[in-house]
């Protein structure tokens, strides 16, 4: 049986002040871990508010001991994170000595919504989602996936949709972003999907979380994107994949 280790580390660029002591001149590294990396372990624990599986708190404690200072969640479902209410999840993470920084979650548009351009029902879902993330102490909500649209019109609709989500996040003191994989570098009606998204979303409402591995896997240069679109990448994700392992979307 092959054991597969996937590590996604969220580098909290410009998110947390760097602490420097005048006496030692040592810089404190602020690095958050994406909990999707340990999903197989977390998914086995049985958490309920009022009763918490000891294995769950042990995992958080071990991550903190390894040097991680914050977490990015990836399990928002029915108003909870890992079967814990937003406030309880925040308490769990902080009790382990880390901060709740971000969360991967999204709601894609249906064929009907894309055809009509009316995504008001999805926005109702987002209203509750944003409220739950705010209660959990999140600073960022990041959409981790969208399929390649069939038409440029559909991609334009998604950009408008993301702008509206981002606007609503801003109103609640959060920021909304998008996390890439490699498929965003495909073309839609002659235009690179990722570039189109960067150019048709409002920087005031939408930032991008660059996954360096997937940019390179998509045969592009992360540095080129940083230079071409300054200020759009607020956080950076580093995905680790061993050479002998097959690609998985992380």
Model-derived features: positions:
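A short alpha/beta connector and helix-capping loop motif
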Residues: 220-238
